[in-house]
Amino acid sequence: MEVYPAIDLMKGRAVRLYRGRRESVKVYGDPVKIAQGFSELVDKIHVVDLDGAFEGRPRNLEVVERIIEETGLRVQVGGGFRTYEAVGRAYEVGVENVILGTKALDTAFLERLTDEFGGITVSLDVKDGRIAVKGWVEEGSIKVRDAFEILRNYVNRFVYTSIERDGTLTGVDEIGRFWGDEEFIYAGGVSSAEDIVRLAERGFSGVIVGKALYEGVVKLEDLLEVAKCLRRG
């Protein structure tokens, strides 16, 4: 089990949203300083370009580049990666994993990326059992398990994001394992060490934690200790 602290970016600032709603934004400050704090405890973080997700193209890659240069952290980033050029630019600035959302359902595009780049990850952004699209603004028609059965032919690394839980601090979804040996990372509502234990029991290999850290609901050190114990078995 791995723990990935999250930084969501909007207009160059670190923010959090409630259930992905733009009007619910809460600002937490300088993302580079926040990343520097995380770098004392972890070597990899999760970054979301919210402007990119809403607008359809990355808008905060310069901030991501600064985070990498000034902290040495490994970074996985999502938000608006819908062209080959945008994905390529992210890898140029030093990103380790580019996370695709909506565009991953274009399997010709996905295949081209996986042929060219390593570390491509797909985010299954779920609401009511279906994949949400266009920055979570629209609910899609495809069921999450149907999407997974298609996408698993191209990638083996996924993020499962519960939109209804995101930013709520209400705990994690009750999800029955529907994947095999693919790497699955959970995001949405994580607010305690017990959540991490439950997710590990369901087969998740990683967890993304955001608002619970920013609001002081849980300490990153405590989550990392639990994750270490889980890895030991």
From Swiss-Prot:
Q: Which Gene3D superfamilies match?
A: Aldolase class I (3.20.20.70)
**Pathway membership, UniProt:** Amino-acid biosynthesis; L-histidine biosynthesis; L-histidine from 5-phospho-alpha-D-ribose 1-diphosphate: step 4/9
* Catalytic reaction equation(s): 1-(5-phospho-beta-D-ribosyl)-5-[(5-phospho-beta-D-ribosylamino)methylideneamino]imidazole-4-carboxamide = 5-[(5-phospho-1-deoxy-D-ribulos-1-ylimino)methylamino]-1-(5-phospho-beta-D-ribosyl)imidazole-4-carboxamide
Among the GO molecular function terms of this UniProt record, one is: 1-(5-phosphoribosyl)-5-[(5-phosphoribosylamino)methylideneamino]imidazole-4-carboxamide isomerase activity
One of this protein's GO BP terms?
A: L-histidine biosynthetic process
Protein's UniProt keywords contain Lipid biosynthesis: no
Which GO CC terms are listed, alphabetically? Answer: cytoplasm
What keywords are annotated for this sequence in UniProt?
A: Amino-acid biosynthesis, Cytoplasm, Histidine biosynthesis, Isomerase
Provide the active-site residues from the annotation: D8, D125
Recorded family membership: Belongs to the HisA/HisF family.
User: Which residues does UniProt call coiled coil?
Assistant: none
First-level EC class? isomerase
Q: Where in the cell is it found?
A: Cytoplasm
**What's this protein's name?**
1-(5-phosphoribosyl)-5-[(5-phosphoribosylamino)methylideneamino] imidazole-4-carboxamide isomerase
